[in-house]
Amino acid sequence: MKAASSNAEQSSHDKILDAAEILFAKRGYAGVGLSELAEVVGLGKSSLFHHFENKAQLYAAVAARILGRIEERLVRSLAKGGDPIVRLERWLDELIDLLADHPTYARLLLRSLFEDDDLPGDTPEEQEAHRAIAGMMASVGALVREGMAVGLFRAANVQHLLLTLVGLTVFPFASGEFGAEVLGKDIFDPAEVRRRKRELRDLLRFGLVANKGR
């Protein structure tokens, strides 16, 4: 009986996160009310508070879940081995696949960057989100430095490069109508996803990789 109750609890928890992810990605932190969210999930507002104390905690939990999934892909990708070029390209390919498979991810992640000021900063969920970001930036930064040390990557400012990689991967999948207008196609179309991978690989090969690493 306890197991069934625990499973039901987890199911409700996940349903709340799933619905919140869609709404927050579409309208942002300020544009979503907990009463509306409870109605979408089919719960009373008091039941919603049983899972999350407030909207800030819920928002941080949604972001932390997305970042955790991205981090999981990064760890798995880097563990497959290969030189720094191969590992970086593989990781970026997997990140693009993940963003393409989950249209809410990129938009919510970009929103969270400038909506962070609305959050108190002290919830476990926020701390977990910040830990995931710091961990991923450290891992990719170490990979880039390794490539520079062995002469595969040209000398570059690693911090600026990390910001560039975030922009190159995340922004296109959050660009909405603007992106569709620029491309003339839907970025989530499988053919465009493949093209995005090729374009990013070429940018790396001709912008970051040293001549002898090409």
What are these regions (language model features)?
Residues 92-95, 109-113, 165, 169, ...:
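Short alpha-helical scaffolding segments that buttress acidic/His motifs in well-ordered protein cores
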Residues 86, 128-132, 148-166:
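All-alpha amphipathic helical-bundle segments outside canonical DNA-binding/catalytic cores
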Residues 64-69:
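Short, basic, alpha-helical segments at the C-terminal edge of helix-turn-helix-like DNA-binding modules
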Residues 1-11, 15-18, 212-214:
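N-terminal intrinsically disordered/low-complexity leader segments
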Residues 61, 75-107, 133, 158-162, ...:
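Hydrophobic alpha-helical connector segments
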Residues 1-2, 97, 101, 134, ...:
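C-terminal peripheral helix-coil segments that are non-catalytic and often amphipathic
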Residues 101-127, 176-183:
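Amphipathic alpha-helical segments used for helix-helix packing
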Residues 11, 15, 23-57, 61:
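Helix-turn-helix
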